[in-house]
Amino acid sequence: MFWRLRARLSYAVARRLMGWPWMVRQPRSWAWMQGQFSRMAALGDVGAQSFYGHLLLFRGQGFGAREEGLRLLRLAAAAGDHKAAYQVGVQALKGDTRHAADAREAARYWGQAAEAGHPLAARKLGELYRSGGPGLEPDDAQAERYETRARQLGL
């Protein structure tokens, strides 16, 4: 019980320290902060999984950082985090050297994010359905539906 409280408090302090650029530039403090993000994500906190997944995806160092970031983002998306779902959709459509671009998977994640209220996901999904993509045929009805949803959400 005590270790969970300690993990939450340490995570809150680490998130607060992210606002201080000079602290992020210090190797020891950065390593400590990453440890707190990792521990909280490993405990199953959806917000921490999303945050640390984004951090590893865009700023991670090492061979496995990108894959670990995507794994954490997928876990957060499965738990309902719309920002993580949007980013997993972007990465699915982009593809990489080991995985081909998959528009169907991108549409699934963007659909989840759009239904949760992510306006950019709705717009991108409308564009994807309008033009089609790798493994996804164009569908004007779905495109219109998601373009309308994007307008409702403010885009």
Model-identified regions with their sequence ranges:
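Short helix-capping/linker turns of helical repeat alpha-solenoids
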Residues: S10, L43-V46, F58-G60, A79-H82, ...
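Hydrophobic face of amphipathic alpha-helices that form TPR/SEL1-like repeat modules
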Residues: R15-P21, F51-F58, Q87-G95, K124-S131
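Canonical positions in the second alpha-helix
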Residues: S38-M40, R74-A76, G111-A113, R149-A150
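TPR/TPR-like (Sel1-like) alpha-helical repeat modules
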Residues: R104, R108-E115, R123-R130, E137-L155
